[in-house]
UniProtKB/Swiss-Prot annotation:
Function summary: Catalyzes amidations at positions B, D, E, and G on adenosylcobyrinic A,C-diamide. NH(2) groups are provided by glutamine, and one molecule of ATP is hydrogenolyzed for each amidation.
Swiss-Prot/TrEMBL GO biological process terms: cobalamin biosynthetic process
Lineage: Bacteria, Pseudomonadati, Pseudomonadota, Betaproteobacteria, Burkholderiales
Any GO MF annotation of the entry: ABC-type vitamin B12 transporter activity
Gene that encodes the chain: cobQ
Keyword Zinc-finger: no
Species whose genome carries this gene: Janthinobacterium sp. (strain Marseille)
Entry annotation: catalytic residues: C323 (nucleophile), H420
Protein known as: Cobyric acid synthase
Cysteines paired by S-S bonds: none
Length: 476
């Protein structure tokens, strides 16, 4: 099991790298994360929903993503509440206190999935969540040492040296663990190192003397990796292209990986705009998905986006709304059942003649079809609770298995769709950008970029695999 001294220490990439290395050797390996908290999720082949990180790790292992790889997914809908997804299906919305009391039941689901994977695969690589040093969350823990103790698996502790304070992070984390948990920790990985390794070696020696545990590997800082991120939204990008794409970043943005292909496009200047930041001029504005459509719609209006969108359209710009962003573009968003919070109805931005009603049932499906405005194929996935209907649906965005999907305005300046991942299909991405005004022969293949990054990760982590196999109690 890989645990980290902090969030974003490198747990996900380390598990992905080890999955790829073992898969290359012919080992039947599978990733597993007991509990994940993220708004960036993926739809599985078995019709469920898991964290984006486990979908990436599945690709690294040469597998189709499956709900057993991430049995508990928490999707925050507010600062104190989240939608609880078990074995790929939404069960209920809970506040933090209620979920803490629910954890023994959640642990049963975790162990069921883990045991199924154990019977099917030679090796199960487990990723922890956050840090095991959160002493306030120790009781009923199912994500870190609580799980490791329950299934009796060894733990590697990874720390990010690029942030600074790496030795304090490791020593401090060990100090917060129980004696049995410290014994379970077999060694450390120092991640994202850049510089002269000889200058680090005295510190490594000191760490091993202080803890009695080995530093298993020092992994380099790898620039330019193209991998799916779960939570951190990258707000900055070097300005390269002349075609300006602007995306607002509301508090509950979801599935921001929709924009990864645009970030990699050499002719696009992608700008993600957070609260309080000036809204720049754009050729294309994209409203992203949201875990709280009405709340994020209120945020957009309060931050001046309604006026910015109207001005953008007056000057001939184009707008795309994805999932929650599509719902916001319509006339109204109704939540009669309180799916996302207090029941009620909100006026939309009024840029598409559709009305949305949020429903308790969630649609989860991988889909494919063609663009309604260009003769090219498209594929992606749907994750949403709600339906949208109205006159604008007569001019759809896509045809999915022959059925109309999404909507376009009468003047063809505004497009809305429930389809996530729509830019990941190279030809569909080019067609959408052409619709928005960019005539380019460039094709960005996100799958190819991701594969190259996984290969780089695996090559960098090979010394770690050798070190693990040299441990006395290591077993594949």
């Amino acid at each position: 099991m890989v645990q980290g001294t902090t969030s974003d220490a490198g747990k996900t990439t380390l598990v992905a790298a080890l999955c790829r290395l073992l898969a290359q050797e012919g080992v039947r390996v599978v990733p597993f994360k007991p509990q994940n908290m993220a708004l960036n999720s993926a739809v599985t082949a078995d019709g469920g929903e898991i964290g984006r990180a486990q979908a990436l790790q599945a690709v690294a292992a040469g597998l189709q993503p499956h709900t057993d790889m991430n049995p508990i997914l928490l999707k925050p809908s507010s600062d104190t509440g989240a939608q609880v997804i078990i074995h790929g299906k939404a069960r209920s919305d809970m506040n933090a206190r209620d979920y803490h009391a629910y954890k023994p039941i959640a642990m049963q689901a975790v162990l069921e999935s883990y045991q199924r994977l154990q019977t099917q695969y030679e090796s199960v690589l487990v990723e922890g969540a956050g840090s095991p040093a959160e002493v306030n969350l120790r009781e009923r823990d199912i994500a870190n040492m609580g799980f490791a103790e329950a299934v009796d698996c060894p733990v590697i502790l990874v720390a990010d040296i690029d942030r600074g304070g790496v030795f304090a992070h490791i020593i401090g984390t060990l100090a917060c663990l129980s004696e049995s948990e410290r014994r379970r920790t077999v060694g450390f990985v120092i991640n994202r190192f850049r510089g002269d390794i000889s200058l680090l070696e005295p510190g490594l020696k000191w760490l091993e003397e202080q803890t009695g545990k080995p530093v298993l590997a020092v992994l380099p800082y790898l620039h330019g990796l193209f991998l799916d991120a779960e939570d951190a939204v990258e707000h900055t990008q070097a300005v390269r292209g002349a075609f300006r794409v602007v995306v607002p970043v509301p508090p509950r943005i979801s599935n921001h990986t929709d924009f990864d292909a645009l970030r990699a496009h050499p002719e696009i200047d992608l700008q993600l705009v957070g609260p309080g930041q000036p809204i720049p001029a754009a050729d294309l504005i994209i409203l992203p998905g949201s875990k709280n459509t009405r709340g994020d719609l209120e945020w957009l209006i309060a931050n001046g986006w309604r006026e910015a969108l109207l001005r953008h359209l007056r000057y001939g710009g184009k707008i795309i709304g994805i999932c929650g962003g599509y719902q916001m573009l319509g006339m109204t968003v109704a939540d009669p059942h309180g799916v996302e919070g207090t029941p009620g109805e909100s006026a939309g931005l009024g840029l598409l003649d559709v009305a949305t009603e949020l429903t308790r049932d969630k649609r989860l499906e991988q889909v494919s079809g063609v663009c309604a405005f260009a003769d090219v194929g498209v594929s992606g996935y749907e994750i949403h609770m709600g339906t949208s209907d109205g006159a604008a649906r007569a001019q759809p965005a896509f045809l999915i298995d022959g059925r109309p999907e999404g909507a376009r305005s009468a003047d063809d300046q505004v497009l809305g769709t429930y389809l996530h991942g729509l830019f990941d299909t190279p030809d569909a991405c080019a067609a959408l950008l052409h619709w928005a005004g960019l005539n380019s022969d460039v094709r960005v293949d996100t799958a190819q970029l991701r594969e190259a990054s996984l290969q780089r990760l695996a090559a960098a982590a090979r010394p770690l695999l050798a070190a693990l196999r040299a441990l006395p109690d290591y077993s594949r």
